Amino acid sequence: MAYNSNSNNNNNNIVVVFDFDKTIIDVDSDNWVIDELGFTDLFNQLLPTMPWNTLMDRMMKELHDQGKTIEEIKQVLRTIPIHPRVVPAIKSAHDLGCELRIVSDANMFFIETIVEHLGISELFSEINSNPGYVDERGTLKISPYHDFTKSPHSCSCGTCPPNMCKGLIIERIQQSLAKEGKKKMIYLGDGAGDYCPSLKLNTEDYVMPRKNFPVWDLISQNPMLIKAAIREWTDGQSMEMILIGTIEEIRLEEEKEKMLTSAENNCKMQTISIGINNVHHEPILPRALRVSQSS
């Protein structure tokens, strides 16, 4: 499911794509809700029996059956740990004119609740995640982004869960951006599911893997498979420094390219002008007037 907002502040050539769990927030949002509401034992008991996305839908039913309300889930989400420099980093990237998107294997309900609480929901032009909604009984329903019960997604990377291939989402984003003109992408993530989209990035793009997390380990096995420039980060503070530094670097390079193009065009115009001035022209004289002879 993709959510689109009217965030149209992007006035540069950069799209920043964030993972959510352990990237924007410091923990896994699914585990946080389950643990904080006291359902860890049941979760661990059921985990070997079904896919993660299916299990989360089952756990939301269990929460409802045990009397847990949607408001209680929201309250837990509002206390989720986040590094104090992450929100300023996101705001700075937006203020610098970047288009911001989220691609996450969490769910829409969790993400929207958290970004709204943080006051940054309007900064993202699109959120791609597993659908999450409250049904008529007051139960939070979570379904897969890709319905793997009907058909598998076409990814053969081997690191993507059955319900979501982030690489396919990035390819769709790239296709839409191509219609708008050339754009550079910065992708931030931490998990194994962030490896496939990292492989899809182009040479002018940047990938920011969280160091010593699964995506970093996968990239480190063979960095030559990654066409994009690799800029690792460790926590919210280093994320802010590296992200904003990369944005400024891209903007500086684009300004240099514009100045160079402008200078080349000026040189061409001067050459044309000089060439015209050096062409020999015969003087153009006015036609003589006939003067009548008076007798």
Curated annotation (Swiss-Prot):
Binding site for Mg(2+): 19, 21, 190
Residues annotated as binding substrate: 30, 105
Highest taxon in the source lineage: Eukaryota
Induction: Strongly induced upon phosphate (Pi) starvation.
GO biological processes: cellular response to hypoxia; cellular response to phosphate starvation; protein tetramerization
NCBIfam families: DKMTPPase-SF (TIGR01489), HAD-SF-IB (TIGR01488)
Assembly behavior: Tetramer.
Record PANTHER family: LP01149P, PHOSPHATASE, ORPHAN 1, 2
Full protein name: Inorganic pyrophosphatase 1
